[in-house]
Amino acid sequence: MFKKDRFSIRKIKGVVGSVFLGSLLMAPSVVDAATYHYVNKEIISQEAKDLIQTGKPDRNEVVYGLVYQKDQLPQTGTEASVLTAFGLLTVGSLLLIYKRKKIASVFLVGTMGLVVLPSAGAVDPVATLALASREGVVEMEGYRYVGYLSGDILKTLGLDTVLEETSAKPGEVTVVEVETPQSTTNQEQARTENQVVETEEAPKEEAPKTEESPKEEPKSEVKPTDDTLPKVEEGKEDSAEPAPVEEVGGEVESKPEEKVAVKPESQPSDKPAEESKVEQAGEPVAPRKDEQAPVEPENQPEAPEEEKAVEETPKQEESTPDTKAEETVEPKEETKTAKGTQEEGKEGQAPVQEVNPEYKVTTGTVEKSTESELDFTTEVVPDDTKYVDEEVVERQGSKGVQVTKTTYETVEVVETDKVLSTTTEVKTPVVPKVVKKGTKPVETREEVIPFATKEQEDDTLKRGTRQVAQEGVNGKKQITETYKTIRGEKTNEAPTVEETVLQAPQDEIIKKGTKGLEKPTLQWANTEKDVLKKSATASYTLTKPAGVEIKSIKLALKDKDGQLVKEVTVAENNLNATLDKLKYYQGYTLSTTMVYDRGEGEETEKLEDKQIQLDLKKVEIKNIKETSLMNVDAEGNETDKSLLSEKPTDVSQLYLRVTTHDNKVTRLAVSSVEEVVVDGKTLYKVVAKAPDLVQRRADDTLSEEYVHYFEKQLPKVNNVYYNFNELVKDMQANPMGEFKLGADLNAVNVKPAGKAYVMAKFRGTLSSVENHQYTIHNLERPLFNEAEGATLKNFNLGNVNINMPWADKVAPIGNMFKKSTLENIKVVGSVTGNNDVTGAVNKLDEANMRNVAFIGKINSLGDKGWWSGGLVSESWRSNTDSVYFDGDIVGNNSKFGGLVAKVNHGSNQWDVKQKGRLTNSVVKGTMTLKNHGQSGGLVHENYDWGWVENNISMMKVNNGEIMYGSGSIDGDPYFGFDYFKNNYYVKDVATGESTYKRSKQIQSISQAEADAKIANMGITANTFAIQDPVVNKLNRIIDRDSEYKAIQDYQETRNLAYRNLEKLQPFYNKEWIVNQGNKLTDESNLVKKTVLSVTGMKSGQFVTDLSSVDKIMIHYADGTKEEFGVSAISDSRVKQVKEYNVDDLGVVYTPNMVDKNRDSLITKVKEKLSSVALDSAEVKSITNNPASLYLEESFAEVRETLDKLVKSLLENEDHQLNSDEVAEKALLKKVEDNKAKIILALTYLNRYYGIDYDGLNFKHLMMFKPDFYGKTPSILDFLIRIGSAEKNLKGDRSLEAYREVIGGTIGKGELNGLLGYNMRLFTKYTDLNDWFIHAAKNVYVSEPETTTEDFKDKRHRIYDGLNNDVHGRMILPLLNLKKAHIFVISTYNTIAFSSFEKYGKNTEEERNAYKAEIDRVAKAQQRYLDFWSRLALPKVRNQLLKSQNSVPTPVWDNQVYVGLGGANRMGYGDGGRVVTPVRELFGPTDRWHQINWNMGAMAKIYERPWKDDQVYFMVTNMMEPFGISAFTHETTHVNDRMAYYGGDWHREGTDLEAFAQGMLQTPDKSTTNGEYGALGINMAYERKNDGEQLYNYDPEKLDSREKIDSYMKNYNESMMMLDYLEASAVIRQNLSDNSKWFKKMDKEWRTNADRNRLIGEPHQWDKLRDLTEEEKKLPIDSIDKLVENNFVTLHGMPKNGRYRTEGFDSSYQPVNMMAGVFGGNTSKSTVGSISFKHNAFRMWGYYGYENGFIPYVSNKLKGAANKENKGLLGDDFIIKKVSKNQFQNLEEWKKHWYHEVYDKAQKGFVEIEVDGVKISTYAQLQSLFEEAVSKDLAGMDDKNIKNHYQYTENLKWKIYKQLLKNTDGFSSDLFTAPQA
């Protein structure tokens, strides 16, 4: 029934057949070796069962048995299933697994010896055995684990003989049947091939005999063979003899047995039998009787031919090969067995093996003999009498017999399996069979019988595995056609056809595995990134078991959101997958999926996802402006070799100098130079490399090579030019020549002659060669400066990039073109300038421009409001026709015109429209204006008579007019709008304002109408083709604004952030920058503001080298800053770049310094700088007098810190990315050539820029980070420039030096701007005055508060005064004092300087105590100035506010120092002692002054008031009491002309000293020069009203001019009253000689004298003389006579002589207040000094300051005198004017006033007390005077009396002081009676 599933068991090469077969079915991986046995439950006795131990066996057990009990039947399968092919175990059977230390596989062999497996799902052999190997217990479905038997128990049970260590070989399974299953009726299951080998000695029984049993068996010899394992073919059966297994010791060898073909006798054999030899060891083990094959029934059909096979039946003694299929083989001889007969009723069942557990063994031997047949051979004898298909047996063959004797070992008389020896011998020889075969010809042919291919399932082979078990062999058949013959001849009858099989075909048998295959294993190997190529390659390893088919391996690339980006199929034979076009900084997921088939259908396995990200972080030079090829010779001299005409022979001397737009220079050593041809252009390819440096190629890929291309310079041919350098040089040398472009030219690396490439006035012709329109590319300056009579035509300017923000009048073609022609020119690019910036030319002067176009950008930064135009700023009588503009205009404060700003015809009315026109032109683009500036989309204006016609605008104007900019459009149309005709703007395109009336008359047209008009304008310039030079493409020259637009993940809204991050990360590539920029939040200032610089800080100080930092300061363009903490990153992963994480930003910071070892270079530079001394020749070549710089102390400091300074210098300067001795050599040469300049510059900056901002020192920032404000100059060049000239190093020019060489370089033009900016940026201060006081550590500033309300909110403080022209030189020295201690008194009019050292205040305690004295003096100075601010006329009052309106007058204390003596100019006192105030301040600023010991103080003034007017104290100390008086004196000289006299100057004929001492100087009693007690007024001192004062005691009480005038009236009238009383008392004495009391104030006509320009009558001086004899006798009866005769008292008056108001001899003379000056000595012109001062006070007292004092002392009436009095400004003219002709001379006026005073006095005055007596009446006073005069006259002749007028003078003083005191300083009424 299951015929096709029969198997036999055979011992083959020592392997039990069941093992071999099981291996085929299961094909396990042998991981351990084990032996498994079924054990019959009957063998496991009750005793043994009691010995079964529960739990798991001890792992130390070497041998043990596992006991299982079946709990269900195994599942059955299909017909092909092994389980259904053989008997099944009965339910309840036990499974005993013998286990040695290792287990290989589980093979369960059933009752009949067949292999029985659990169902496929029940036991996974590998997993199960591996588990058993580890844990000792196998869990198997269908079996229940019972327990285990130890090795000792197994021995007791007699089950240990099969378990010896050496008996089980790896892979071998020995099965013992111990169960007695029920007999089966299925004869197929009872065949002998289904018997199993028993490893224990089997009982020998005789097989039952049959009638057909042969009597004899021929013998055959058995030979050893090494045949391979037999193949089991489908449909065939193999019989196998039981293979003996030796259980104890040694290996078992097997010898082959001969295979004998078995055929039924009914079919004759036509072929000799084939022999099959099988190796066996020793003699075969005789089978038990129950193991012999039962007899097949006779009706069993014969096996088909293709299923017949050699069968071997297990024998005990004999086997008969010729036995028919239905016969049973009988043994010829019987052998005794221990149990010869089966028990009754149990036939067919396996006998039970008894176990004899004995421990002592007796061994012996037993010999057995068996006979076997030997086949005979057949001999064929040819017979030509018969046809070839006829044969006759001549003799029958007979078989031989072979006897085999085997000796076995016996144990306790029981035979064992063990074979000790085997011998064979032939008992009966073989008799060959003889057959005659016909050879008579017949027609025969042979044909091939194709073999068939059959498949057999094999569950030992992995599914999907196909294995050829038997090769197919084609058969042969013979086809015989037999013809009937007559006498040997054929007849025509059809032949008889017979087919004879000559060779049967052998089927091809293919075993098809059904066992589940191992899973293939796919693993990640690695992922290799190629960052520059934006790719990554994933590599795998694949382990694929045979038979498994890999359907696909796919790699899916997913983005961060899980979206599939791409999918790549991985080839099985190339396990690499490259993913290209990856994005940087994108987190990708790599998902790998493998689909495979193990014969069970497709299965899918996913690998663990891998994350991958390409982070490109390299060094990239960005924002490149220019790349130059530099050559350095052996001496270190640099030469620009960019304009190559041949390939350099030695690249070792070359380096690339890469300059960015912000002026940063990077140097790269050149590795190679190659001449190449690209697009027909010969170029030089220069290559450099540096660590981690990448360069962007033209195709936007990145390379690790830095390559720059230079054009090969071709020489001119005649006047045709092929290189720009040669062209501009020749045009400069020969500006009248004719020049032609023979090709496109490139201006890169060509140096301009100045502001333009050609500075000479060009008068020649420039064009392209005929029929060409060539282009000059890459202009960075205007082509021409100016031209006259020139012709420019037929060329273009391409890629223009002019960036000149400092320059006015900037245009690509040039500035001025006079009487020139410009035609057919196209300009494309960008132009930036200050004021007057255009796209073509600045001015056309009677010139013609036609068909010229500009396309690009224009940016005017200036604020002067100049004209600027899209093409032309000013067109003066010039014609601009058919021109075109399409661009973006940005203006700050300019008068822009979209095409032309000013179209100006001029005043010639006869050629209107012929000249001065703009016609047939187009303007497009945008115009963005900060200030309106009267800008227009088409023009600014067309005054006068400029003809503007047929023009079209599409300009979008923001903050300007849509067409016509100027308000003049609404002016007289005859000059303007009448000539503005047919000009249109395009509706819905052009935009802008129309704020003027006539603007609204300008019409719009549609785009279509505009296009139609434009088509007829003849404009073609805009269409001229411009091809980018190949070097532009190769060098990737792009517009700065477009630099980031092509970068991955670029966001337009983050463009500013990217620019800003370049400052934080100056080295990194653009992709990195964009990625970092996109990480910022929208609120970040890096997104919203422009960054100027980023500077590292440590502990609150700037770090200017590569030292570690803990914070960075980000400085924004709006003047703000942010500080962020940073933390160092140990490895930036970019060579030579130091990196920090920035707190709160999520980005990194890298200092703008290359991080590399510079020790050697630092040493060399330091050596060079150290060699410089201040008195060296190098320094003296810069300044003849190094000592005049006062830099000795700073120079010493610099030398002491040179190590650190040089380190900072080089780290900021040296951006050499690769090692290059050439560049280093050039650097050292530069240092050597400029070492004196460098060291002086460092010394200067160290001296003057150590400024403190709330503890933040500014010095190193100035030295090494001048890029802080946004510009990036070369540090070395910056220092060299500073140190190159003496004027840059002098302390008195610190302000100018900053402006000239520092400010413009760093981006802050003025020092004041720098200090104010820094103050706001770095400190909490908002006022520079407050900050300065705080920052100037060694300066005490006294700022007395003004009482003048109008001045309180004006600039009047210390910094206001210092930041004022000439005082600017003091700012930096004061901020940088180290040892000197200065104090400054700052008022709105003056600024006074002195030092604590001068007054011997050398300790902090002394200085602090002295500050109160400083404040006292400061208050006095302020009080004086405030007095004048109240007194001065409103029109000139603000002239006193010099701190705001001019320059405060400097006041310098003298240079005498307590304990040091007088200091010389160099700052050394007596004995050479250092005077630090001079060394640190007064010396360097040139404010030291030599002491003039002949004067107390002096003023230096100019003929006209000047900013450098100054006051110097000489002998007098500023801080002395008299110092205040001296201050009022000297400042009178400075201020009087501008403020004290209402703006009028000194009265003609007077000079300086006539106005100070004795007039406007505040008197002080500390001096003895007559000032105190003379006419005057106290404007400065605050005194007590104690009755001892001579002047107003508190100036601030007189808080208005009216009060001051009132005071002066009381002051003068009190003195006049006293004079009147004295005069009256003297007159009453009736003197016979008037000279006893009086003398004369006479006139002296002026003569030639110093400072006098008026000579002769009527120009007079005062002449004080004695009375003439006549005058002595002159009767005096009233005061009027004294007035009329100009008598003066002898007392109080100076000695006789001439008193001048000019010069320096007598003009100082004061007038004693108690002296009687009765007359006025009226002059007809100028006057003498005593009269001048006396009259001035009296005029002030009577007419007031404005109407009396000023007209008298100044030139106020000079104009009137010139008109009315022949130019004579005399007293007579003045009194007439002042009194309005009431008085004709001073004497009339004074007499009148005396009487007024007398009358008022008679009516009453303020009560006083004199010598204890109260006085309240005039009579009382008169009595006192008469007494005093009498006493004085009485002692006239007494020579012992020194003062003969003492009683009178003393009385006058007593009364005066009382009057002053009792009127509260004359601030209240002097006279008590009501005044009329």
Curated annotation (Swiss-Prot):
Residues 201-239, 252-262, 271-292, 306-347 have a biased composition (Basic and acidic residues). PROSITE patterns: G5, GRAM_POS_ANCHORING. The modification Pentaglycyl murein peptidoglycan amidated threonine is found at T76. Residues 34-76 form a propeptide. A motif (LPXTG sorting signal) lies at residues 73-77. This is Zinc metalloprotease ZmpB. Keywords: Cell wall, Hydrolase, Membrane, Metal-binding, Metalloprotease, Peptidoglycan-anchor, Protease, Repeat, Secreted, Signal, Transmembrane, Transmembrane helix, Zinc.
